[in-house]
């Protein structure tokens, strides 16, 4: 891995974020930023995203998540920085 691929974050989003294309929105933004990881719906109605890559691009993704896609309502987006593990090759939507 390159020296810039050295950040990992977990992003938890609350609000009207399920049933509005939120995970597909995140997938598209993450792929545009060349980030790896996954996004998934949680049973409590939240969307969780775990992402690795360049910190600047993770911050770009976080800002996009705070805005959300049309039809969504983001009430809260929490980001937690973690040590990168390097165990993702692509970005995917987990069921």
Curated annotation (Swiss-Prot):
Residue ranges of every copy of the Acylphosphatase-like domain listed in the record: 8-95
Active-site feature positions: 23, 41
TM regions (residue ranges): none
Enzyme class, broadest EC rank: hydrolase
Keyword Secreted in annotation: no
Catalytic activity entry: an acyl phosphate + H2O = a carboxylate + phosphate + H(+)
Gene designation: acyP
UniProt GO MF annotations: acylphosphatase activity
Family label: Belongs to the acylphosphatase family.
The protein's name in its UniProt record: Acylphosphatase
């Amino acid at each position: 891995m390159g020296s810039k691929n050295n950040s990992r974050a977990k992003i938890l989003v609350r609000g009207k974020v399920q049933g509005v294309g939120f995970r597909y929105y995140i997938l598209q933004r993450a792929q545009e930023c060349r980030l790896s990881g996954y996004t998934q719906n949680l049973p409590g109605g939240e969307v969780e995203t775990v992402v690795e890559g360049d910190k600047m691009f993770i911050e770009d993704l976080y800002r996009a998540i705070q805005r959300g896609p049309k039809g969504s309502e983001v009430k809260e987006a929490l980001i937690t920085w973690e040590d990168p593990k390097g165990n993702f090759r692509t970005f995917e939507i987990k069921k």
